[in-house]
Amino acid sequence: IKGHCVHKGVLKEPILNESRRGKSDSNAPTALLVLDLDDYKPEVRLPASGITSAHLTATVEAIRAELPEPLRSASCIANASSSTGMKADGVIGLHLFFLLEHSVPVSQLTHWLTGLNFCVEGFQSQLKLNRSGMSVKWVCDPVVARNSQLIYISAPEMVGVTDPFVTPADRWALVQGATPTCNLLPTLVNLVPATVQQVAERTLSELRKSLGLKTLKPSYRRMDIDGEKVQVLTNPDQLQMTLIRTTDKYAYWNINGGDSNAYYNPVGNPEIIFNFKGEAPFEMKRANEDVYNWYCEQYKTQI
């Protein structure tokens, strides 16, 4: 159904034609584990056309075999993203939903998902920089651990192109395992977040160095934004910023030639650029002063 998505966490109260901001308990333990694999080239490729649920199952079974226990033995539900089958070189996007035997803290789950990018060979070998150059583009996105996260599951509307899947239902598969749930608690007990963070920072430095960029030494200031404490990056790289569109509330940007439309600011306040990628928000003026000045002039009646 058009527009359908999964809200990762339980809502505090019903939502009706309003923002979901602040409506979920960000610290509530979760029993839903989602692996969001983005721009991933699997070992077992999907066919270029005529993709069925059986094809999807075979691909996911091969991916699951690379995962650590207890995921390797657990059943999961697979959902192919809207771009799957449309990109070159067999690159796909997948959501894998696992049910946990016991609820776990979101913060621990976030670190563990980040660590999967280093301990799964197929993930680690495909890591690269985000377009901003200031963060790693994870194969397995840790942002989906958040209780407030939306996970888009609707089949795409195909206009002028042929759907590579036989039917919308073929974008889904129940991939049976030895157990219906998985118990992450023993694994999370031994998790050291500082170790994961160090590996993440080293990976970022190595990827930046490979592109001739210096090591990023981030500087932050803590700001109160809409009642929330936010760490804002005050020394971003110089960025190419392209305004894509504006709505009544927000302006959306692409960075360094990207096409995700994942960066945004309130129309009337261009000071801080936020994003949907899990990167730290940054000061627009520091990233591109010319664009900042242009925006302030262009939208001065709304600022």
Functional labels for PLM-detected ranges:
Residues 116-217:
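Catalytic "initiation/cleavage/transfer" segments centered on a nucleophilic residue
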Residues 89, 97-99, 185-273, 278-281:
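Long, charged low-complexity interaction segments
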Residues 1-94, 98-116, 206-218:
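Signature for HUH/AEP ssDNA processing cores
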Residues 20-23, 83-85, 139-141, 259-264:
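Generic recognition of flexible, low-complexity loop/linker segments
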Residues 45-47, 162-168, 286-287:
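Short conserved micro-motifs at the rims of enzyme active sites and ligand-binding pockets
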Residues 26-29, 145, 267:
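Flexible, charged surface loops at secondary-structure boundaries
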Residues 36-38, 81, 99, 153-158, ...:
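Structured loops at beta-to-helix junctions and adjacent beta-edge loops in soluble globular domains
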Residues 267-303:
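Short, small/acidic-rich helices and loops at N termini and domain boundaries
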